[in-house]
Amino acid sequence: MANHDPISDMLTRIRNASEKRHQTTRVPASRMSRSIAKVLQQEGFISEISEEGEGVLTHLVLELKYSGKHRHPTIRSMQRVSKPGLRIYKNTRALPKVLGGLGMAIISTSKGVMSDRDARKQGVGGEVLCYVY
């Protein structure tokens, strides 16, 4: 079956693995998924990114982070905002603050994929891909 929204697929795989306390999860590799994974790593939601396979069958292996004695997931929720049927764009001043700054939004800008904080610092807006907290 064809996957019409690879970003939603990636977020769902990460969310499901996190809820089940899996150490790693695999997502199909693409430029967008690599960029999103890099932002999640920079913001401290995942610990390591590696690639597996080659060509069309390349997958990213994401090592998830947990905290505390009971291994609480660092990622509590991931929500897709802009969808293929309804794109959501925001300028610099309208970029959302997720949970009053405790979470983050991942933004696709003309300067690449970045967190909402980085987009504000650089003074760029763009497509709001998802919220993570």
From Swiss-Prot:
One of its GO terms (cellular component) is ribosome. Keywords: Ribonucleoprotein, Ribosomal protein, RNA-binding, rRNA-binding. It comes from the Bacteria. GO terms for molecular function: rRNA binding; structural constituent of ribosome. One of its GO terms (biological process) is translation. Signal peptide: none annotated. Pfam families: Ribosomal_S8. HAMAP family: Ribosomal_uS8_B (MF_01302_B). Belongs to the universal ribosomal protein uS8 family. This is Small ribosomal subunit protein uS8. It comes from Prochlorococcus marinus (strain MIT 9303). The gene is rpsH.
